[in-house]
Amino acid sequence: MELCQPTSLSDHDQPASGPQRGVMGLVGPDAPRGWSEEPEEHAQLQRWPEGPNAPICWPEEVEEPHAPSRWAKEPNAPRCSSQEPDESCHLAEELEESDSPRCWPQEPDTPCHLAKELEEPDAPRCLPQEPDTPCYLAKELEEPNIPRCWPQEPDVPCHLAKELEEPDAPRCWPQEPDAFCHLLKEVEEPDALRCWLQGPDAPCHLAKELEDLDSPRCWPQEPDESCHLAKELEEPDAPCHLAKELEEPDAPRCWPQEPDVPCLLAKKWEESDAPCLLTEELEEPDALHCWPQESEAPCLLAKELEEPDASHSCPQEADTGCLSAKEPEEPDVSHLWQGVPDAPCLLVKEPEEADALHCCWPEESEEPDALNPPCFWANEPDEPDPSRCWSEEPQVLCLWPEEQNTKRCWQEEPDAPCFWPEDREEPIVSCLQFKEPEKPKVRSSWPEELEDCCPTRGLPLEPLLADGELLQACPGPPSDPGPALSLPSEPGTAQEEGARLRAVFDALDRDGDGFVRIEDFIQFATVYGAEQVKDLTQYLDPSGLGVISFEDFYQGIVAIRNGDPDGQLYSVEPVQDEETPACADEFDDFVTYEANEVTDSAYMGSESTYSECETFTDEDTSTLVHPELQPEGDVDSAGGSGVPSECLDTMEEPDHGALLLLPGRSRPHSQAVVMVIGSEEHFEDYGEGNEAELSPETLCDGDGEDPAFLTPSPAKRLSSRKVARYLHQSGTLTMEALEDPPPEPVECPEEDIADKVIFLERRVSELEKDSAAAGEQHGRLRQENLQLVHRANALEEQLKEQEFRAQEKVLEETRKQKELLCKMEREKSIEIENLQARLQQLDEENSELRSCTPCLKANIERLEEEKQKMLDEIEELTQRLSEEQENKRKMGDRLSHERHQFQRDKEATQELIEDLRKQLEHLQLLRLEVEQRRGRSSSLGLQEYNSRARESELEQEVRRLKQDNRNLKEQNDELNGQIITLSIQGAKSLFSTSFSESLAAEISSVSRDELMEAIQKQEEINFRLQDYIDRIIVAILETNPSILEVK
């Protein structure tokens, strides 16, 4: 699932535009909000990416540096709500942008980040309910007055968890991947809560807080994810009121599961100086902070000042609660971090009773020995000392070992990865999980065999041993009688230890040839800050071959662990009624464990921050001091967080997993937490902070005793982001660890003094060896210096010889250049003489041409006169031709007129003849009738009539044909005459165009080549004329040869 990463003005110069920028004005009838028109010291406009999941948050204009925020004047209006339906709202981005505002998302498809609480102390942390009442959603490090809470809407249904059929089963995480978790349903009104999941399939992730510092921190709202915060209620329509804030100001603020469940988010809102802490209680240290599961148990997320003995939790059972935070011991402390800037954030406190604590998030595993889930958070209700696992990210595993017989919880499906996913692009790697064959009753929080369970890289955790052999990395819950997660002083078998070291060696062996080059090891140790590289190489490569074999590597690690040359082990005197802490064994085993941890993570081709040896060695700082004497400057305030001097931590942050160990104050039953922190790509140091050195005394802690501390080494520093990352991800430190007085230093036993003496003897021998080596090196350098002096003298002699040769060569080159110059001058003089002779010749030719010029001019004048005469003749002939053409035109017009007249006469004659013929026929018919009357034969008369009619018709036809023949002859004669006339005119035009120009003018204006071309054109024209005349004659001979007859 991808989470939208917010960006701020620290990354961009201009604020977002369009729908992503907050617009001043009222959004709803009850929603006045304090918008910031210009950037203030503690309020800036924030810019988010343009994607569909981009968050929207409006900054607050803060006039005073420590003012919580200028919210709306009406107490019932929610503040800092997102207005875009497709935008995600970050409640608090507190790691990267110190001044960015915090709010809740409105879009079901966008992630909402609960709180980024370490880097940005000045940004508001949620939606305050009253202008002067700060409400703390999470624990802040530097600014206790920052408001944190959720606005309450009386009509918003909130399904935090689904109540199960069995009353004793934990009520938190769903066992079905499709279970719906609706922490809050968004409504159209601007006063509706903008935080919880909207979609039916949306997973609910509590908070991804510290590992990926740049990723959003809240409840992602994308569907189809496998990890849900809680199962949907059996009655999805049952309303869950966070708080009826608009109607009842004193209504409890929480997430009840049923209408009769009293769930209080904050007890008092009216008192301006009483902040509502979501994760802490001020009055009663034993109060529970958890989430509600049943109606019989009251759920008080933060009940302040009025009911100190009330259980502040959302209970799972009447006697089961999840501690969201540990409360300070002083009741007047208003904030967890107020006045304690250097204290780590203790996210979870467990009650003193062994059976009182049940984590709010997990769900009981139906099979106690089920090993499929890679992590778990809480124990079973039936088991007194179950283990807890808090998996926050694909590469973050927080193990809460609380008993040897560890059970697994939070099992959704056999293959469902139980972690809070984060926006990461890294490949999925398998969890390395180891099984301890020696302790069959001890169950680790990891499966028994290596399996690709989830995209996390787990660490091989050793089985838990006795209470005296604990490695207290971080104080566990005080009430859990289970022992802390410990590393055994000796591996189970030599084969297992060899397997772990083999994994480390294979990670360092880049070439795969079975050897690790000493240069690669030194480079690795130098890059990761190891200060005793020489001592390490002496142990790992005693023969000085330049390569490290696995046998040397194994023996060196065993020697470092057994002899402990670099750790500078010191023992502490046990306090009264306590046993002496078994320090050396646990510390030695921790070296082995560290090597195995580095195998899984640090050497997998990624950049790491600290080497495996840097954590345990420091040549300069090895004195046991009081924790109070530790300088206060050894904390980093760049991200608004700090580490108290009592907490000396060491942290490995490789690519896929790391070990974070923080010793805290002890408990009757000491607990330890090993934080496996991944995502090395998000490591970025903001500012310089001093780190604390991890000593064996720090790593070992007896049953119910406080550890001893060392002065922090300035060479080994944990950045504020590492500290911040621990503060939110450990989730196990308690406020009592900060409020209790620092542990008193104890005296070291005689055995530790003997170890110190042995160590000092070793150091003296090493220094003697170094001195001898320095003397040898000095003599060698003197010898080399003498050789270099001799060589310098020889080079000086050689230089002098080279200079002499260079001078001779320069003289020779100068002589050659002079000879070449003389030769070039002679050649140039000869060329000048030749050019002068050529110039004289050209002058003579020019004089000759000038003498011919008058003759040529006379010829030109003569030719021009001839040309003029020819032009006059041509003009005269042209005039005559025009006159003839005019006469011809007139005659043609007259002829056409006469022809037209003749045609009309002819037609009139034809009509007259036709009339006469008709009259004749009529008369003949009358004659025949008369003859019939006279008695003549009709047949003879009819024949005679027919013969005469036929004769008359033939005569008319003959006359018509004769007339047509005469017309055709006349037309032929006319056409022939026209052809001849046109031929003559064409010939004249050709001759006139050919002789239109004077020959002298043409000769004077054209060159020889052009003249020859003109002659060729003239010959071509003559040829064409001859051909044209021949064709005319042939046409005349064919049509009318009589025209050519001589009369």
Curated annotation (Swiss-Prot):
Molecular function terms, GO-annotated: calcium ion binding; dynein light intermediate chain binding; identical protein binding; molecular adaptor activity; protein homodimerization activity; protein-containing complex binding; protein-macromolecule adaptor activity; small GTPase binding
Gene3D superfamilies named among the record's database cross-references: 1.20.5.2440, EF-hand (1.10.238.10)
Gene encoding the protein: Rab11fip3
Gene Ontology, cellular component aspect: centriolar satellite; centrosome; ciliary basal body; cleavage furrow; endocytic vesicle membrane; endosome; Golgi membrane; intercellular bridge
Lineage: Eukaryota, Metazoa, Chordata, Craniata, Vertebrata
Membrane topology: Peripheral membrane protein
Superkingdom classification of source: Eukaryota
Subcellular location: Recycling endosome membrane; Cytoplasm, Cytoskeleton, Microtubule organizing center, Centrosome; Cleavage furrow; Midbody
Species this protein is from: Mus musculus (Mouse)
Record-linked Pfam families: EF-hand_7 (PF13499), Rab11-FIP3 (PF25450), RBD-FIP (PF09457)
PANTHER family: RAB11 FAMILY-INTERACTING PROTEIN 3, RAB11-FAMILY INTERACTING PROTEIN
The protein's assembly and partners: Homodimer. Interacts with RAB11A; the interaction is direct and is required for the recruitment to endosomes. Interacts with RAB11B. Forms a ternary complex with RAB11A and dynein intermediate chain DYNC1LI1; RAB11FIP3 links RAB11A to dynein and the interaction regulates endocytic trafficking. Interacts with dynein intermediate chain and dynactin (DCTN1); the interaction activates dynein processivity. Interacts with ARF6 and EXOC7; the interaction serves for recruitment and tethering of recycling endosomes-derived vesicles to the cleavage furrow/midbody.
Spans annotated as Disordered: 1-107, 311-335, 475-496, 882-906
Sequence positions that bind Ca(2+) 1: D509, D511, D513, D520
Protein name: Rab11 family-interacting protein 3
